[in-house]
Amino acid sequence: IVGVGFAANVNGDGEVIALGRDAQTTLAEVPHHIELDRVLITGDAALGQRRGIALNAAHVTIANSDIRDIKDVGQDSQAIAGWNTPGPITIRNNFLEAAGENILFGGAHINIPNVIPSDIIVEDNYLTKDPLWRGTSWTVKNLCELKNARRVLVRRNIMEYNWSGAQAGF
């Protein structure tokens, strides 16, 4: 998918793009070899958006894209989150703005036996939170969080504008 823009869902529920499903139970069900390049995902300025991309696929590259205004009240929100994926995943040269975790791997039940999100590269990205969100009701958490992942390389990223909110961490 190249050069496509996506707006928030009605009421900001769910994810704008779902690559795979959290209900898939075998590797044969996992979609694979997907590339998102120069994609724009924008949450609703007033209502927010729970998640930009649910990444439950294999051999995925997200590059040169802009995911912004991802935020929610009372629950986590993520620009990119993956949990039911074997990998590999490359997240490169993106603008990622979310109130919750900008990037999250793990944190939800994995339905494929013996699968751990693996072989993940996160490089040359700009992870941020809008400073205007400080002191509001948006649920603020970490810029990058790995709850369940292995063989992860994080390099040459800029991570800024994080403060203690629903979680004290970076």
Per-range role (PLM):
Residues 81, 143-145:
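Short catalytic-loop micro-motif centered on adjacent basic/acidic residues
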Residues 2-8, 28-43, 58-71, 86-105, ...:
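Right-handed parallel beta-helix
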Residues 76-77, 105-108:
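Leucine-rich repeat
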Residues 15-20, 53-54, 79-81, 169-170:
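Aromatic-rich beta-strand patches that line glycan-recognition/binding surfaces
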Residues 25, 52-55, 60-61, 79-82:
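Long, hydrophobic, well-ordered secondary-structure blocks that form the structural core
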Residues 43, 47, 51-54, 69-71, ...:
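Alpha-solenoid helical-repeat scaffolds
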Residues 13, 49, 76, 99, ...:
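Beta-rich catalytic cores
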